[in-house]
UniProtKB/Swiss-Prot annotation:
<dbReference type="InterPro" id="IPR018085">
    <property type="entry name" value="Ura-DNA_Glyclase_AS"/>
</dbReference>
<dbReference type="Pfam" id="PF03167">
    <property type="entry name" value="UDG"/>
</dbReference>
<keyword id="KW-0227">DNA damage</keyword>
<dbReference type="InterPro" id="IPR036895">
    <property type="entry name" value="Uracil-DNA_glycosylase-like_sf"/>
</dbReference>
<dbReference type="InterPro" id="IPR002043">
    <property type="entry name" value="UDG_fam1"/>
</dbReference>
<comment type="function">
    <text>Excises uracil residues from the DNA which can arise as a result of misincorporation of dUMP residues by DNA polymerase or due to deamination of cytosine.</text>
</comment>
<keyword id="KW-0378">Hydrolase</keyword>
<comment type="similarity">
    <text>Belongs to the uracil-DNA glycosylase (UDG) superfamily. UNG family.</text>
</comment>
<keyword id="KW-0234">DNA repair</keyword>
<dbReference type="InterPro" id="IPR005122">
    <property type="entry name" value="Uracil-DNA_glycosylase-like"/>
</dbReference>
<feature type="compositionally biased region" description="Acidic residues">
    <location>
        <begin position="54"/>
        <end position="64"/>
    </location>
</feature>
<dbReference type="GO" id="GO:0097510">
    <property type="term" value="P:base-excision repair, AP site formation via deaminated base removal"/>
</dbReference>
<dbReference type="GO" id="GO:0004844">
    <property type="term" value="F:uracil DNA N-glycosylase activity"/>
</dbReference>
<feature type="compositionally biased region" description="Low complexity">
    <location>
        <begin position="7"/>
        <end position="24"/>
    </location>
</feature>
<feature type="compositionally biased region" description="Basic and acidic residues">
    <location>
        <begin position="41"/>
        <end position="53"/>
    </location>
</feature>
<feature type="compositionally biased region" description="Basic residues">
    <location>
        <begin position="69"/>
        <end position="83"/>
    </location>
</feature>
<protein>
    <recommendedName>
        <fullName>Probable uracil-DNA glycosylase</fullName>
        <ecNumber>3.2.2.-</ecNumber>
    </recommendedName>
</protein>
Length: 370
């Protein structure tokens, strides 16, 4: 009997825990479990199938004659495939095992800087997105008047030798890992982490709040861990800051600004405003009953675009040390907004609320413990 491809985003498994990414015996262990790969060995391929490595490429029951037929068919189509490939852009992403994009190890870091990827200082964002499920969205934003300006601004930053983070291969990291149809929860951050974990290794990795393995846990993420422990969603705080397992379970983690400059906060916030707004609109218009988690003023502003009757919104102050214990005054969602006071981050069971809502919609809850 042939095996079925296993989708790591599937809700069909009734188990409460997802496949383990880290060893339960040693949370400091940074060894990568390469159990999930992108079936995309050529960077020029547009396909991005996710499957488990222990699955056979062919059926156990496949006959020898069927195998020969496939071999002949493959040889016949080889030339045509090559000619098609030549017409495609040479993608800068998609040629790695998928876990290398989200299980990044600071002690084994191989991602290139912006100037290494675009030595001519001409940024082409389309080369940084390989998951085909997002191509419709990207085609839409490419038609907008702001998009050429966005690429021009990023190109000008390179000409000025700004050290942009995250690095290009990681810019659309969450999008490249998680297809839009598998998103359950959207957690909005504000700005990529601006600093370096060690020399040549930025904290920023294209997933809000997450950092590479063997990097110190940032204070905002430490406060998130404290909240998880407080409401019994986590046994103890991990010694790493990698949130890969959340993403693989359907948590879409982005910042309102996709880039910043190394050691500087907020400098590219306006650069990405229109792009991020269109991304939120795309999700809210094309998908139903998503959960949006708005921490802080920037995330709240973006979520004012979300229809609260169609989607579920959880709002509080930001988990940063400066606001984690403070309430936040802003406007309510929906038509006829009024000034309201939102609770402090540390007073809300964010992750419990998420799972309660998922269960109420017969969706598999997120296993938050790392």
């Amino acid at each position: 009997m042939s095996k079925k491809n296993v989708d790591p985003f599937s809700d069909s498994d009734s188990s409460s825990e997802p496949p383990s990414i880290f060893s339960s015996d040693n949370e400091e262990n940074s060894d990568v479990d390469n159990s999930v790969i992108i079936n995309d060995k050529n960077t020029k391929s547009d396909e991005a199938d996710i499957k488990y490595m222990d699955e056979d490429e062919s059926s156990d029951s496949e006959s020898e004659s069927e195998s020969k037929k496939k071999s002949k068919k493959s040889k016949k189509s080889k030339k045509s495939k090559k000619s098609v490939t030549k017409k495609k852009n040479n993608l800068l992403v998609g040629n790695r095992i998928i876990t290398e994009y989200i299980l990044i190890d600071a002690n084994n870091y191989h991602f290139k800087s912006w100037i290494e990827c675009f030595p001519d200082c001409k940024v082409n964002l389309k080369l940084l997105l390989f998951r085909p499920e997002w191509f419709d969205f990207f085609k839409y934003v490419e038609s907008k008047t702001y998009f050429p300006q966005l690429e021009s601004k990023l190109s000008s930053y390179l000409e000025k030798r700004q050290r942009i983070v995250p690095y290009p291969e990681l810019l659309f990291n969450t999008m490249n890992v998680l297809p839009p149809g598998k998103i359950k929860v959207v957690i909005l951050g504000q700005d990529p982490y601006p600093g370096s974990c060690i020399s040549g290794v930025p904290y920023a990795m294209g997933c809000s709040f997450s950092v590479p393995l063997n990097c110190p846990v940032p204070k905002s993420l430490a406060n998130i861990y404290t909240n998880l422990i407080k409401f019994n969603h986590m046994r103890k705080a991990p010694k790493h800051g990698c949130l890969a397992s959340w993403i693989l379970q359907g948590t879409f983690m982005i910042n309102s600004a996709f880039t910043t400059v190394l050691n500087e906060s907020g400098v590219h916030a306006r650069t990405w405003e229109s792009f991020t707004a269109d991304l939120i609109d795309y999700l809210t218009d094309n998908y139903d009953d998503l959960i949006f988690v708005a921490w802080g003023a920037h995330a709240h502003k973006l979520c004012q675009r979300v229809d609260p009757k169609k989607h579920y919104i959880i709002t509080s102050s930001h988990p940063s040390p400066y606001s984690v214990s403070n309430t936040m005054t802003s406007m309510s969602y929906g038509p006829n907004p009024k000034k309201v006071t939102y609770p402090s981050f540390n007073s809300v069971d964010h992750f419990g609320k998420i799972n309660e809502h998922l269960k109420s919609r017969n969706k598999k809850p997120i296993f938050w413990d790392l």
